[in-house]
Amino acid sequence: MPLLNSVTTPYAEALLQVVNENLQTEEMVSEVKQLLELINDSPELEKALSSPILETDAKKKIIIEIFSNKVNSSLMNFLKLLADRQRIGILTSILERFLEIYRENSNIALATVTSAVELTDEQKGLITQKIINIAGTEKLELVTKIDPSLIGGFVASVGSKVIDASLASQIRKLGLSLSK
């Protein structure tokens, strides 16, 4: 992914610089997350934006039609710029890189917690505190996923650290120790 980062990083840094100058960072981070969610939920949109067949003007019309009421003017101008420079096809990578740089600059760790069932707010709070202690960071962004195959418990990952407190893992370990 280093080659893609060499393309996405300048755009992501430019967007971050614009929002920092306009003091819109938190608002922009929220909009970028919503935009990523919208694109990830719509494979047709992602195909259209990355299609080499569609002309730049057609892509800009799609952007204006879909995003004009959903994003602020700075982000809209950024999307149009990407279309003009024929980089709109890597929009998700640019936005993900923007969030990575934002987290790095703000000392925010990204943690993914996968559980067998939906976690309550109390459970999320407890897990967040444990992960903050382990990761040695002040702030944490928690992404939750559900995987019923875990049976119970959770698996949390922050960077290269993984905490496997799942029932499936414990059963697997028990099975391995019994087979010896």
Curated annotation (Swiss-Prot):
Q: Which GO terms describe its cellular component?
A: plasma membrane-derived thylakoid membrane; proton-transporting ATP synthase complex
Q: Where in the cell is it found?
A: Cellular thylakoid membrane
Entry's Gene Ontology molecular function annotations: proton-transporting ATP synthase activity, rotational mechanism
Query: Is Transcription regulation one of the keywords?
Result: no
Pfam families recorded:
OSCP (PF00213)
Per UniProt, the keywords (alphabetical) are:
ATP synthesis, CF(1), Hydrogen ion transport, Ion transport, Membrane, Thylakoid, Transport
Q: How does it assemble?
A: F-type ATPases have 2 components, F(1) - the catalytic core - and F(0) - the membrane proton channel. F(1) has five subunits: alpha(3), beta(3), gamma(1), delta(1), epsilon(1). CF(0) has four main subunits: a(1), b(1), b'(1) and c(10-14). The alpha and beta chains form an alternating ring which encloses part of the gamma chain. F(1) is attached to F(0) by a central stalk formed by the gamma and epsilon chains, while a peripheral stalk is formed by the delta, b and b' chains.
Q: Which family does it belong to?
A: Belongs to the ATPase delta chain family.
* Official protein name in the record: ATP synthase subunit delta
Gene name of the encoded protein = atpH
